[in-house]
C-alpha cells in the first residue's frame, strides 16, 4: 500500500494547533448528518473548554474510536490500536495525534485499503465532532494515492462530517487535471460541504494547507469550479469562492479583476463575493480594485486622527477617533481603513491594515468616526513595548496619523 512522500508527511505533522482552532470554530454547524442505521452515538463530548486543543485526541477519544471500530469490524485489534496511540501521547502535537490515529487504524484494522475505508465510512457518522473526523481524511491521503478515484470519492463522503480540504490536496498534486475534473463534478452535489470542498480544497494558498504551486503559477484550471459556484445558494460555499479568488489576487490581481469586471455586480451576492475577494487589494490601495467598487477617486477631505489613551498597557482598550471634513462640492464614496505599525522584537516595525468602514460623505459634510480594539496578544501576533504609529487610509491613500505608546 502506497504511503505519502516524505514532504507530504512533513507537512501533515507540522504544529498548527492554534491555527486549527480558527479552522474548527469557523464551522459553526453540528454534525447532524447521522446514518439512521448507525449505532447510537457514544463518542465522548468535547471538553468544555479543552485544556489544550490536542486534547480533542485524548485517551477517552481513542477508546471511543476503538470501541466503535470493534463493533463495526470485530477483527479490529483494539489493544494494538490503543498501544500505538497512547505510546508517547503527551509529547505529540494536535496534528501529530491526528496522523498517529490514522496510522494506528491502518495497523490494527485488517483488510485491503478499500475495506478499511468502508469501515471508516461506517464510523464517520458516529464520531459526532467535526474536527476529530479529520483523521479519516488523513487516512485516505496517507494510504490512498494509488487508488485515486476510490479515494477521491471517499474524501467526498468524509467531508460531509467535517472537512477534507487538507486531505484532497495531495491528490491535486499527484494528478491535477484528474482531481479537478472530479471536483468540478462536486459543484453539483446536493450537500453544501461537498460543493464547498470543490472550491476550498483547490485554493492555491489555503491557509495552513499544502500550497498548490501549479495553481499559484496558473489559476485558470480552477476557473470552471468557481464559475459553477459563484451563484450557489449557500453563503458557506460563496465565502469559499471569495476566499479562493482572494488567494489568486496575491499572484494574479489583474486576472481576478478582469473576471470580476465581467460579473453583474448589481446582484448583491456577486458584489459581496467580489468585494470579499478583493479585500487584500483594497487594503493595499490597488487602483483597479478601488475603482471596481466606486472608490477610485482620491478623497477630497481634511482628516485628523487621534488615539486614546496615548499610553496604555497590554490588555487595555485603544480608541481611535477620525474627524473628516469634506472639501468637495459633491458627495464622495469612501473606503476607510486604518494602518497600525506594530513594534517588532528587533525594534523595527511591521504594518497591518484593518478595515474600518465604507461611507458616502455628502458635500462639505463633517463626520466623526470611532473605532476601538483591545490590545492583546494572539497566536499570530505578539506585541512589544514602544511607540506605535497609526495611519488613516482613505481610498488607498494615507491621509492622517497618530501615535500611542505601549508600555
Regions found by a protein language model. Give the residues of each.
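Intrinsically disordered, low-complexity Pro/Gly/Ser/Thr-rich segments with frequent PxxP/GP/PP motifs
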Residues: 354-374
Amino acid at each position: 500500500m502506497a504511503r505519502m512522500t516524505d514532504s507530504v508527511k512533513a507537512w501533515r505533522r507540522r504544529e498548527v494547533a492554534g491555527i486549527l482552532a480558527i479552522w474548527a470554530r469557523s464551522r459553526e454547524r453540528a454534525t447532524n448528518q447521522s446514518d439512521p442505521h448507525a449505532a447510537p452515538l457514544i463518542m465522548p463530548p468535547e471538553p468544555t473548554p479543552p485544556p489544550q486543543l490536542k486534547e480533542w485526541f485524548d485517551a477517552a477519544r481513542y477508546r471511543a474510536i476503538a470501541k466503535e471500530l470493534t463493533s463495526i469490524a470485530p477483527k479490529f485489534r483494539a489493544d494494538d490500536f490503543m498501544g500505538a496511540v497512547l505510546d508517547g501521547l503527551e509529547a505529540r502535537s494536535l496534528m501529530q495525534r491526528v496522523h498517529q490515529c490514522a496510522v494506528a487504524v491502518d495497523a490494527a484494522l485488517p483488510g485491503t485499503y478499500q475495506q478499511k475505508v468502508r469501515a471508516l465510512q461506517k464510523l464517520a457518522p458516529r464520531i459526532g465532532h467535526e474536527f476529530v473526523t479529520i483523521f479519516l481524511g488523513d487516512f485516505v491521503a496517507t494510504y490512498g494515492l494509488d487508488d485515486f478515484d476510490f479515494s477521491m470519492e471517499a474524501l467526498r463522503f468524509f467531508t460531509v462530517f467535517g472537512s477534507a480540504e487538507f486531505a484532497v490536496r495531495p491528490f491535486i498534486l499527484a494528478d491535477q487535471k484528474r482531481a479537478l475534473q472530479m471536483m468540478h463534478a462536486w459543484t453539483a452535489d446536493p450537500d453544501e460541504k461537498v460543493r464547498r470542498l470543490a472550491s476550498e480544497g483547490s485554493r492555491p494558498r489555503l491557509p495552513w494547507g499544502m500550497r498548490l504551486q501549479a495553481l499559484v503559477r496558473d489559476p485558470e484550471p480552477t476557473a470552471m469550479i468557481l464559475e459553477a459556484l459563484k451563484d450557489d445558494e449557500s453563503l458557506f460555499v460563496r465565502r469559499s469562492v471569495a476566499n479562493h479568488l482572494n488567494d489568486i489576487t496575491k499572484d494574479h490581481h489583474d486576472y481576478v479583476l478582469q473576471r470580476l469586471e465581467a460579473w453583474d455586480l448589481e446582484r448583491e451576492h456577486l458584489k459581496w463575493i467580489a468585494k470579499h475577494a478583493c479585500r487584500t487589494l483594497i487594503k493595499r490601495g490597488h487602483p483597479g480594485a478601488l475603482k471596481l467598487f466606486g472608490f477610485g477617486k482620491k478623497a477630497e477631505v481634511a482628516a485628523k486622527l487621534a488615539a486614546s489613551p496615548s499610553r496604555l498597557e497590554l490588555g487595555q482598550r485603544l480608541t481611535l477617533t477620525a474627524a473628516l471634513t469634506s472639501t468637495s462640492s459633491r458627495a464622495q464614496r469612501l473606503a476607510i481603513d486604518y494602518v497600525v505599525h506594530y513594534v517588532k522584537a528587533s525594534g523595527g516595525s511591521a504594518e497591518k491594515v484593518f478595515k474600518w468602514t465604507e461611507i458616502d460623505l455628502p458635500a462639505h459634510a463633517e463626520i466623526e468616526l470611532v473605532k476601538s480594539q483591545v490590545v492583546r496578544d494572539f497566536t499570530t501576533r505578539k506585541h512589544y513595548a514602544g511607540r506605535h504609529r497609526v495611519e488613516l487610509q482613505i481610498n488607498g491613500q494615507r491621509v492622517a496619523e497618530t501615535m500611542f505608546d505601549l508600555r
